[in-house]
Amino acid sequence: MTAVPVSQIRNFSIIAHIDHGKSTLADRLLQVTGTVSDRNMTAQYLDNMDLERERGITIKLQAARMEYVADDGEKYILNLIDTPGHVDFTYEVSRSLAACEGALLVVDASQGVEAQTLANVYLAIENNLEIIPVLNKIDLPGAEPERVLDEIEEIIGLERTGAIRASAKEGIGIHDILEAIVHRIPPPADTVAEPLQALIFDSYYDAYRGVIVYFRVMSGSVKKGNKIRFMASGKEFEIDEIGVLKPFQVPVDELHAGEVGYIAAAIKLVQDARVGDTITLVSNPAATPLPGYQEAMPVVFCGLYPTDSDQFEDLREALDKLSLNDAALHFEPESSGALGFGFRCGFLGLLHMEVVQERLEREYDLDLVTTAPSVVYRVNKTDGTVLEVQNPADLPPSQLRTSIEEPYVKVELITPQEFVGTLMELSQGRRGIFKDMRYLTPTRTTLIYEIPLAEVITDFFDQMKSRSRGYASMEYQLIGFREGNLVRLDIVLNGEPVDSLSCITHADKAPEVGRQLTAKLKELIPRQQFQVPIQAAIGSKVVARENIAPLRKNVLAKCYGGDISRKKKLLEKQKKGKKRMKSIGSVDVPQEAFMAVLKLEG
């Protein structure tokens, strides 16, 4: 392959809210430019994980290099860097946008601008990208292009004259989009002569070649056989293979500034090649890494336990393999009295957690029990140290701590006017602090709240969708820790605390949560031969209690009439037996009880 002049390269990504047609548009571009032959084309070509196709979401990033001969007769190289559209993966989106000079903003002509569209547009503006608005799905009977163009102009502030009307499904407007990419998106800066700086925007694990790193060369050039260094981790490797992505890999000898490609260098751990890190040459290193690198921090935690304890090692192996591909997944072994051995796992958000659980069950054939999702709490202890608590069972007793801080998020809800009241009620019910309310158009409103993350990670999203009949959309970002009046609620069964059912909750809500939990457990725990009290306690103070009535045999059945003292003797004997049984009996909590409690909390 011949070296391409930098002026002929265009790097762009596609940003859109879920279901606005991003993957279909990518398919059309690949097809029209002849990158993927019609014979090999499958719907959503770039979403190559089954789960991605099923849920219709893009989880892992992909990249594709297309060759396009424009109307002016020049041949251009277009690099499409695909972005995940979901809020959990914001960091990945920001890195892939940093690897581009322009972006196609895809907006559904019937839905209009949604919360995540906006969030990603702000990221694109921060990275100084040229944004080309594309009105997708104009062939739908419900399309209202004029209204949506007004929204694009009013909410985002892009000129409506520059918007392209298209239908990715029908192939309308694709040529105009390609021309706009060539003529409106600027070429990369010509920095071939400078030391190598390349931005990693994705990496994945290949069983034969180790970690494959996807990157964009920002300055300098890189060849096969070069020794490279990852600047954040400090690790050094020699390049075995370097190439471009058409989405399949094609080896080349050299890549220079502005190009996008992949490297294989016998890297063992994804953690060594993290998204956002800078690659440079050992022989002629860059003075500074590229800005914007962050370690992926898990936000939501939950316990994963195999239903069959023999599968513990299989689960460890599966998590090891998944973490090869997912640097944001953290896990460490933990054991619980009720569930046996398992792992405490950290995720970027709820979707990330669901995706990981589903992949474990589907790809590794495991049966899992998951504990309720929780967040990290910061505990300020009396001796001045700060402890980070992920598992409610690890919370130090109240006399050893001065305060507990919990993470807060800024939640932005975009909703049609008529649902504002019910969504405000939902946010305030979740201890939300009202910050701002803006009218985007006469019929659409943005609500901005600050809400504790613990209240958002359960079923906030589902509630928001059902209260707004699916029309509202949300976006959240972490804004830091704040002190709160938090307590640990323990469930005590027959005098024994059950560690896996503990949860940290706000003091005002604790009695209510306790009542719901005990009532639910009463339905689910099978009756024993003796009475079983279920209590919800904060420290030593019981806030809710239910009793499970005992099963009893009718010991008087064989007494016909007869003396009352005879009956009394038999009843006393039964009572003593029950008492003895209660002191030595243990209550097993069935798995359904755990699941139900999660549903209640979740």
UniProtKB/Swiss-Prot annotation:
Q: Which reaction does it catalyse?
A: GTP + H2O = GDP + phosphate + H(+)
Per the record, the similarity remark reads:
Belongs to the TRAFAC class translation factor GTPase superfamily. Classic translation factor GTPase family. LepA subfamily.
Q: Name one Pfam family in it.
A: EFG_C
- Record-linked SUPFAM superfamilies: EF-G C-terminal domain-like (SSF54980), P-loop containing nucleoside triphosphate hydrolases (SSF52540), Translation proteins (SSF50447)
- Membrane topology summary: Peripheral membrane protein
The cross-references to NCBIfam families, in alphabetical order and at most eight, read:
lepA, small_GTP
Instruction: Tell me the residue numbers annotated for binding GTP.
Output: 19-24, 136-139
Q: Which PROSITE patterns match?
A: G_TR_1 (PS00301), G_TR_2 (PS51722)
Q: Which UniProt keywords are listed?
A: Cell inner membrane, Cell membrane, GTP-binding, Hydrolase, Membrane, Nucleotide-binding, Protein biosynthesis
GO terms classed as biological process: positive regulation of translation; translation
Provide the species name: Gloeobacter violaceus (strain ATCC 29082 / PCC 7421)
HAMAP family (UniProt xref): GUFP, LepA
Organism lineage: Bacteria, Bacillati, Cyanobacteriota, Cyanophyceae, Gloeobacterales
Determine the domain of life of the protein's source: Bacteria
Its function? Required for accurate and efficient protein synthesis under certain stress conditions. May act as a fidelity factor of the translation reaction, by catalyzing a one-codon backward translocation of tRNAs on improperly translocated ribosomes. Back-translocation proceeds from a post-translocation (POST) complex to a pre-translocation (PRE) complex, thus giving elongation factor G a second chance to translocate the tRNAs correctly. Binds to ribosomes in a GTP-dependent manner.
Gene3D superfamilies for the chain: 3.30.70.240, Elongation factor 4, C-terminal domain, Elongation Factor G (Translational Gtpase), domain 3, P-loop containing nucleotide triphosphate hydrolases, Translation factors
Q: Where in the cell is it found?
A: Cell inner membrane
List the protein's name: Elongation factor 4
Q: Which enzyme type, at the first EC level?
A: hydrolase
**What do the Gene Ontology cellular component annotations say?**
plasma membrane
Quote the InterPro entries the UniProt record gives. Answer: EF-4, EFG_III/V, EFG_V-like, EFTu-like_2, G_TR_CS, GUFP, LepA_C_sf, LepA_CTD
Q: What is its EC number?
A: 3.6.5.n1
Q: Which GO terms describe its molecular function?
A: GTP binding; GTPase activity; ribosome binding
Question: Any idea where the tr-type G domain is?
Answer: 7-189
Gene of origin? lepA
